[in-house]
């Protein structure tokens, strides 16, 4: 199975979701002074959305900084997005933005810290996703 990398702000919603998943994961730090995780294997990114009403700023700056590194970006295989449905069209927009920019699929979207059903679906979905992923280079 591949890895997980996530970003969670001070609210901790994404961190709570990842903890409930029960899978090892690297955390992108809030502070730019802290060291970024260095994935050694392909990974799925879990990312919250912070868009304004027009969709600007959907991807947190820390995540942009993380993905701007070519070695880290090369190992990205998919994205799981989170957001708040109160924001309508910008709900989980960070997932679509990352998907488009990095040419990876949006694997799932959930609201805030997710539900027990979201946890079950993501656990099963990741097991299936990594079961079909070829980890060797062609």
Swiss-Prot record:
Gene3D superfamilies: 3.40.50.360. One of its GO terms (biological process) is protein modification process. One of its GO terms (molecular function) is FMN binding. InterPro entries: Flavoprotein-like_sf, RNR_Ib_NrdI_bac, RNR_NrdI. Probably involved in ribonucleotide reductase function. Belongs to the NrdI family. This is Protein NrdI.
